[in-house]
């Protein structure tokens, strides 16, 4: 989340540049800019594609939710919109300026440096905090679905989003504008200068006023701000995400195994009644596959996030203790190269381009995306049924149909089961994810089971990261 030079090291030609500045030689004055080399052209193309992809993906997510009433009705999508907006700001307010500086080899925007640094910290922190809020929302919806349905109102969702953005602003604009984030190196208009330049006075013969068109937007962080901001922006949120997604997996595992045991018993009873060979291990294998898919799903969520941001935040905390840093010891481990640091900065920002794919590409979003892009007639129309295990963390194709007698068999094997119309959950402590299994069987007004329609699962289904849609009291969305 830092500009070039933030790791306390200098560009290879930076000292030569300062020497020219000290001698009064203007750089980049009337002379034309040198032509871009092959590496600069490749860098420009790659960064442009990344920025465009980030913009399009997050704009598409926002447009889909604004257009679809069904998506707007889901409170979790409030957090998805907030995440998309923060990632959109990364693509608009952060990436383009750094991309130009990367290609040009210097910071051409002068005193805008401080504002850009504040935007960088704010947008990146907001994106990470929104990911943390989404994980907490999903855990709450899965572990306490009925309480979640009562408590998670639009007002509550907006309060949670507001807190995430407020915290992001507090740790970015206030410290940056007050220069609390900087080390003790002298600076001019947000542009760091060597100590010998800082000690010059206007009446000295070789005094030079900095040329803002040829400077480096260097913002070396002091130790206090580097560690505290990293804790708030990354380490605490990632710890919360690890805990919540671990709990989600355990809850999903329990649900899958309990449902699988009911499936095996029902299949065994049905096959024995029809004099067919009993194969109870089929559902067991399906259960293992489902658990594996849930694990893969959660691994993608955490794996992408950690791989994108962890390297940067490790360096962000390590750099103030480097030997080349103004606050670092005279002898210590050297700072990383500028190229390495920049690569990890872009890795972190690349997370904003992947979030729309991870958090929004489920069946409902895909349908609206197809309408927005005008390809609804060409896109796949394979029906997707979301199985409410772990509150729609998994989606399956409609292939295997369990009819009336199997659904009824589940109820006969659950002696304490009651229909949802007669069962109320008043005690949150007694509520558990498996309570929703009672909602499989429902009686219509004329006494016929509604479950005779279908209850569909697909053991070979395709995984997708779906939104959270908690069960309503009547057992349907």
Swiss-Prot record:
InterPro entries: Dopamine_D5_rcpt, Dopamine_rcpt, GPCR_Rhodpsn, GPCR_Rhodpsn_7TM. It holds the Pfam family 7tm_1. Keywords: Cell membrane, Disulfide bond, Dystonia, G-protein coupled receptor, Glycoprotein, Lipoprotein, Membrane, Palmitate, Receptor, Transducer, Transmembrane, Transmembrane helix. It is found in: Cell membrane. Glycans are attached at residues 7, 222. GO terms for biological process: activation of adenylate cyclase activity; adenylate cyclase-activating adrenergic receptor signaling pathway; adenylate cyclase-activating dopamine receptor signaling pathway; adenylate cyclase-activating G protein-coupled receptor signaling pathway; associative learning; cellular response to catecholamine stimulus; chemical synaptic transmission; G protein-coupled dopamine receptor signaling pathway. It is a multi-pass membrane protein. Residues 1-39, 105-114, 181-223, 321-340 are extracellular. Neuron-specific, localized primarily within limbic regions of the brain. The keyword Metal-binding does not apply. Residues 67-77, 137-158, 247-296, 361-477 are cytoplasmic. A lipid is attached at residue 375 (S-palmitoyl cysteine). GO terms for molecular function: dopamine binding; dopamine neurotransmitter receptor activity; dopamine neurotransmitter receptor activity, coupled via Gs; G protein-coupled receptor activity. The chain crosses the membrane at residues 40-66, 78-104, 115-136, 159-180, 224-246, 297-320, 341-360. The keyword Transmembrane applies. SMART domains: 7TM_GPCR_Srsx. One of its GO terms (cellular component) is brush border membrane. SUPFAM superfamilies: Family A G protein-coupled receptor-like (SSF81321). Signal peptide: none annotated. Disulfide bonds join 113-217. Dopamine receptor whose activity is mediated by G proteins which activate adenylyl cyclase. Belongs to the G-protein coupled receptor 1 family. It is linked to Benign essential blepharospasm: A primary focal dystonia affecting the orbicularis oculi muscles. Dystonia is defined by the presence of sustained involuntary muscle contraction, often leading to abnormal postures. BEB usually begins in middle age. Initial symptoms include eye irritation and frequent blinking, progressing to involuntary spasms of eyelid closure. Patients have normal eyes. The visual disturbance is due solely to the forced closure of the eyelids. In severe cases, this can lead to functional blindness. This is D(1B) dopamine receptor. It comes from Homo sapiens (Human).
